[in-house]
Design a protein with these regions (language model features):
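N-terminal secretory targeting modules
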Residues: 1-73, 129-132, 138-180, 206-216, ...
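Surface-exposed cleft-lining segments at the edges of enzyme active sites
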Residues: 78-83, 108-109, 168-187, 229-233
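A structural signal for short, well-ordered beta-strand segments and their strand-loop junctions
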Residues: 102-107, 133-137, 201-207
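Short, well-structured alpha-helical segments in soluble
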Residues: 118-130
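Histidine-centered active-site loop/cap adjacent to the catalytic His
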Residues: 228-255
Length: 255
């Protein structure tokens, strides 16, 4: 079998090429939020939001590292992916526009620290050019994602939140791992130190305080405004992505 560790792609597959306007079950939730938040809500007037993923399942126009010129990589969870948000509002798109340097967005919905490290390790063992810098929004510590050869499910997630909402019920993997002290913490630290040892500049940040404290990295805070949330009223919105963009640009000026 042509396992993903040996194939010619620079990154693990996170899904399939697809295009959609709504996440599963989102239409009903949108109607509820519209009624709850009223006409001052940024998404009160419906504006088509198309999410397109490339052949590796990432929401990124640049799929593989360019053979000529610099490029950046931006890793993280659904907040980097830009779930429930128009592409042009994402921090990665803003960085690309401001610098003229392509940004490969490797945001994975439900992704954990381990898959960030695995993707970087896969790239480093390939013949592809390496990035000018890696930008990482470190996700929840108590979460992991593993590449699969199943074409219908390219990533297997171990996440207590998913299990509580009906996922991976047959294993209860997160509950099992949580009973063993340090399992999540050790893998998260290992992933962090591996990525930060690749001899290219790494811009680290977190959105939540406990993650920033765990890794001892900067925290980019939510802006106190309703417009700060995406269409689900949970994920990072337009203003928050501007904050992230400003943090990244400030750090890029020092590397």
């Amino acid at each position: 079998m042509d396992y993903q560790t040996t194939n010619s792609e620079p990154f693990y597959s996170a899904g399939q090429k697809q295009q959609h306007c709504w996440e599963p079950g989102e239409k009903a939730e949108y109607k509820r939020l519209r009624a709850q938040l009223g006409s001052s809500w940024a998404y009160y007037e419906y504006e088509e939001l198309i999410t397109c993923t490339n052949r590796l399942g990432y929401r990124s126009t640049t799929v593989v590292p360019p053979t000529v010129g610099d490029y950046f990589i931006m890793c993280g969870c659904s907040n980097v992916f830009g779930q429930y948000l128009h592409e042009w509002h994402r921090a990665s798109n803003r960085v690309e526009k401001a610098t003229g340097v392509p940004v490969i967005n490797l945001g994975i919905c439900g992704g954990g620290a381990n898959i960030i490290a695995m993707n970087m390790q896969k790239l480093w063992f390939s013949n592809y050019p390496k990035p000018r810098a890696i930008i990482v929004q470190w996700p929840s510590i108590h979460r992991m994602a593993f590449p699969s050869e199943d074409v219908e499910c390219r990533l297997i997630h171990i996440d207590i939140a998913r299990e509580n909402s009906g996922g991976v019920q047959e294993t209860h993997a997160s509950e099992y791992l949580l009973r063993h002290e340090g399992v999540y913490e050790n893998q998260a630290h290992h992933a962090f130190h591996m990525v930060n040892s690749l001899e290219v500049p790494v811009i680290n940040f977190a959105i939540l305080s406990y993650i920033a404290e765990f890794y001892d990295i900067p925290r980019v805070r939510f802006v106190s405004a309703q417009d700060d949330r995406a269409r689900d009223n949970l994920h990072c919105g337009r203003l928050m992505n501007k904050q992230i963009y400003k943090h990244i640009m400030k750090e890029l000026n020092t590397v």
